Amino acid sequence: MLWVAWKMLIGNRAKYLGIVFGVMFAALLIAQQSSIFCGLMSLTVSQIRDVEGVGIWVMDKNVQFVDDVKPLADTELFRVKGVPGVAWAVRFYKGIARARLEEGSYEQMILLGLDDATLVGAPDGVFMGSIADLRKPDAVIMDEAGYRRIWPNQPYRLGRVFEMNDRRAVLVGLTKASRTFQSFPIIYTRYSQAVLFAPPERKVLSFVLADPEPGVPPEEVCRRIESETGLQAVTRQQFIRKTIRYYLAKTGIPVNFAITVLLGFVVGTAIAGQTFYLFTVENIRQFGALKAMGTSNWTILLMVLSQAVQVGIVGYGVGVGLAATFGYAIARGHSRLSFFMPWQVLVITGVAVFLIVLLASLLSIRKVLIVDPAIVFRG
């Protein structure tokens, strides 16, 4: 009977493709928009992920997310170092600086200052120059995407000079740092150099980066730091979750994407449901003939549901495949649009498609179950 259901389904190619299109459209829109949303959320925490080898972030108690910098006094570093369980702690500067380029134009940049002695927080993807070059006077390293933005269609060249806060900065390296939510070029330099590049402030210490001693849980060290210093201390994963929660709760990004996803679900259900219902009405005599031959209602129900499942599988596969192709094209084209498709997106899309085909089939099931077998013998 399942084979009969399949042959009935593809008998009218136009209606079959119409049902598949409705499901595919919904799957494409849900998967694509959900992946773009996940990509945007990943951008908000990219700089936390890029700082490798750091177990604990210490900051002002009122900081809500990674870009919400509230400077600390430099003496807080020594207070953190004195907390039992802290293996080491270093300074870290994060801020926005305005750079004056060689041709006279200005550009906003994300300025990151690394500890002078250890260079903790330095990027891993340096492909021109080296991290050690940061120890040179006025030295900075820039991310590749930022270089392409400032000097588009120009070859990579070290030694470029620009100014920040009326101070000379020399480009000594390029790195493949992760893109950020703000999309500004990223500048890495030594902490002592960063505070000179930045606008003058009484307090300049953005974060204290620390690591627990071997065998001591990071969460326990965070509690000790908070208890003894009054500062906020979180692990790397806690800081990532805290930042994402802020953007989910305090911005309109989730609502905007949710509306688009809901629209795709409704439109997909409407197209698939209407087309599937018309398909059922067109084949009502065939279902009546099956009933006249003794086919039970349960078998008829199974046939309708199997048709819906087959449409769902095809529509889901094509829709998700097109969404993934869209993401691949974005990655290859160096687009500023972010795209990240974790397995959760595939599961959510699958559940949505299942609900769509279920709702679409429910519109037709009653029509099939109440059909009179005598319809076969009517003109």
Kindly give the residue locations of the regions a language model identified.
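Membrane-interface helix starts
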Residues: L9-F25
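C-terminal membrane-exit region of the final transmembrane helix in multipass inner-membrane proteins
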Residues: W3, S338, P342-G379
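A short beta-strand structural signal in non-transmembrane regions
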Residues: I56-M59, Y147, L174-T175, E201-E228, ...
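Peri-transmembrane interface segments
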Residues: I36, T44, P218-A270, L278-I284, ...
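Transmembrane alpha-helical interface segments in multi-pass membrane proteins
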Residues: G264, Y277, Q286-A331, I348, ...
